[in-house]
A protein has these predicted regions:
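Exposed alpha-helical structural elements
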Residues: 18, 26-30, 107-108, 202, ...
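Positively charged n-region of N-terminal signal peptides that target proteins for export
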Residues: 1-5
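Aromatic-patch recognition
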Residues: 61, 66-198
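Long, compositionally biased interface segments
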Residues: 195-245
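Generic low-polarity alpha-helical segments
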Residues: 15-22, 42, 55, 145, ...
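Bacterial N-terminal signal peptides
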Residues: 7-17
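General N-terminal leader/first-domain-start detector
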Residues: 20-81
């Protein structure tokens, strides 16, 4: 393969008129074949266009497409520009800068990476009874801790939704439509049981024999940093502590 690519690079410096017709045809076929590997990713329908003024973003974090990997329909694709429409729970793919995204069929998406983080489709991995949408893997050990960010477009007057769009997101009080951010958490135990998580005690109670040690460890950390942990921080820290023992 390396020799083939080197030959193609050398030939590319020659005028087309000096290349045999057969060589030109072979080169075109070679590049078509190389590009065809990811063509299936771009066959979906166009991403939904939100033709309104709104605060916040419908995306998982921001509107930037980031390069990642995706396992789609049983095949792994590398270095693909991806983003997530969190309002519709759709994985978007783009094949060129300036072009709108295409939607990947969720039933064929097993997992993907975005911004260095791993995301999974629980229904593709565990069946239709699992929670729908995409979930970010916050801790990947014997017990997994996952997070789902969802967005909902809501009416917004007098700045009442300002604190519900996420940190560092621009806000204009003259706009009366806002994408409100919501976050859900769950754990998947070593036995494969999926448990929704709404409180710190739910995580701690997963390990009844170690609750006292967990409490002491967390108190020591919170004293050191002089603040209480968020639910997300707490879940990751508890699982790290338990699995390190």
């Amino acid at each position: 393969m390396k020799t083939r690519i080197l030959i193609l690079l050398l030939l590319s410096f020659l005028p087309a008129s000096l290349l045999p017709a057969q060589a030109q045809g072979d080169d075109e076929a070679f590049f078509r074949q190389a590009a065809a590997g990811s063509c299936i990713l771009y066959r979906g329908h166009q991403a939904y266009a939100y033709h309104i003024h709104y605060n916040g973003t419908y995306c998982w974090s921001d509107a930037e497409f980031k390069t990642g990997d995706v396992r789609y329909n049983g095949k792994l694709y590398h270095d693909i520009p991806l983003n997530v429409d969190a309002a519709r729970q759709e994985l978007l793919v783009r094949n060129a800068v300036g072009q709108g995204g295409k939607v990947l069929s969720r039933e064929f998406v097993e997992w993907f990476t975005l911004g260095g983080q791993r995301f999974v489709n629980l229904q593709a991995l565990s069946g239709p009874k699992a929670p729908a949408g995409y979930w970010e893997v916050l801790f990947d050990g014997k017990t997994q801790f996952l997070r789902q960010v969802s967005k909902k477009l809501m009416k917004d007057y007098n700045g009442e939704k300002r604190q519900m769009i996420g940190e560092g997101v621009p806000y204009d009080s003259r706009i009366h439509e806002t994408f409100v951010r919501d976050v859900a958490y769950c754990v998947i135990t070593e036995a494969g049981e999926l448990i929704p998580v709404r409180s710190k005690s739910q995580i701690r109670n997963l390990f009844p024999a170690q609750r006292k040690e967990i409490r002491r460890h967390i108190v020591a950390l919170e004293d050191r940093f002089n603040r209480s942990m968020t639910l997300e921080e707490y879940g990751v820290e508890v699982l790290k502590f338990v699995e390190a023992r």
